[in-house]
């Protein structure tokens, strides 16, 4: 029986770095042969111009997306949930909700950060500091580059970095 992974990651559209990495993972024959995989694209934007903009349609899509993630985690029962959170911006509160719901279901969560922004956003917003603390608590983190570690060292010990 192959280990099960639920990938919650951005894939195109829109096309940007994290979405391209998500597409590479999704299309990887090695990953798909070694693991039983399910994929959920949490993206709410169809173009780069819409990234970071809030609309009523996006709010409803986000709720639907979160319910889909919870349902998939409950039914598929993955051994691991791979999640690509936003590094900065108000999307961290969505990430907090998703990661918390996965942890409540006793799912092992690994986060993959693709860029910086955690430190600067948390320094400017008190509730962001609390959110990041909860998001990173008891999770392992994959960093795209070791130079990203100072951005999250306040929240994640080096022993939980891959």
Model-predicted regions and their roles:
Residues 1-45:
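N-terminal subdomain of nucleotide-sugar transferases
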Residues 7, 39, 83, 111, ...:
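Structural beta-sheet core signal
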Residues 76:
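Active-site charged/polar residues at nucleotide-handling catalytic sites that mediate phosphoryl
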Residues 131-162:
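Donor nucleotide-sugar binding/catalytic pocket of nucleotide-sugar-dependent glycosyltransferases
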């Amino acid at each position: 029986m192959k280990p099960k992974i639920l990938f919650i990651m951005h894939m195109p559209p829109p096309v940007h770095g994290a979405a391209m990495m998500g597409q590479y993972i999704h299309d990887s024959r090695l990953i798909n042969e070694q693991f039983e995989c399910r994929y959920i694209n949490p993206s709410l934007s169809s173009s780069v111009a819409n990234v970071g903009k809030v609309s009523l349609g996006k709010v409803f899509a986000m709720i639907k997306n979160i319910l889909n993630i919870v349902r998939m985690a409950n039914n598929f029962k993955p051994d691991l949930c791979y999640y690509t959170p936003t590094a900065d911006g108000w999307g961290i509160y969505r990430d907090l909700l998703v990661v918390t719901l996965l942890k409540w279901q006793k799912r092992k969560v690994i986060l993959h950060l693709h860029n910086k922004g955690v430190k600067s956003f948390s320094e400017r917003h008190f509730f962001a500091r609390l959110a990041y603390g909860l998001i990173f608590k008891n999770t392992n983190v994959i960093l795209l580059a070791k130079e990203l570690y100072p951005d999250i060292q306040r929240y994640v010990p080096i022993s939980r970095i891959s």
